[in-house]
Amino acid sequence: MSAFVIDAFEFSRLKERREGAIPVTDLTRLADELADSSGTLHWTLTGGANHTDHAQLTLAVTGQLQITCQRCLTPFAFDIDSESVLILARDEAAADEIDALLDDDQIDVIVGTKTLDILQLVEDEALLAMPLSPKHAVCPDTSALEALKSGKKESPFAMLKNLK
């Protein structure tokens, strides 16, 4: 069994804890969404039980990603600092039942397995933490940058001379 594949219920029952770091390039679904796939995500997974004695996993993911601003189309750094609580259910029916009992949007219920891939959970968490439409707080002025690069600024009235 891979070091990143766990028996989710046993991991929770034993209150185990694992942590690590993974290069963003190893997370293909995430890398496809980024301006640059450099960087590393740090993660911590802790097993346990919630107040109703259901098996639970707590996943924390931190790191910095390079994403593209949807306004100016330039890359910028986005910090991820996300933590999720995942309650484990034996099957879909039990997951629906537990979800209805908890009535808490901050807690997700998933179907646990004996072969749960930690890295897939980390990648899912990072994807969910990204903004739907990423934007700078204040975009850099790219028009001034382009004018400097070209060296010559065209007059806004230049096209009027062709109207004669």
Regions found by a protein language model. Give the residues of each.
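Charge-rich, low-complexity linker and terminal segments
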Residues: 1-15, 77-164
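Mature extracytoplasmic or otherwise solvent-exposed domains
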Residues: 33-40, 64, 71-90
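Alpha-helical protein-protein interaction elements
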Residues: 35, 68, 149-152
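A positional/architectural concept
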Residues: 1-66
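Short cysteine clusters
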Residues: 69-72, 139
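Secretory pathway export signals and precursors
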Residues: 65-68, 135
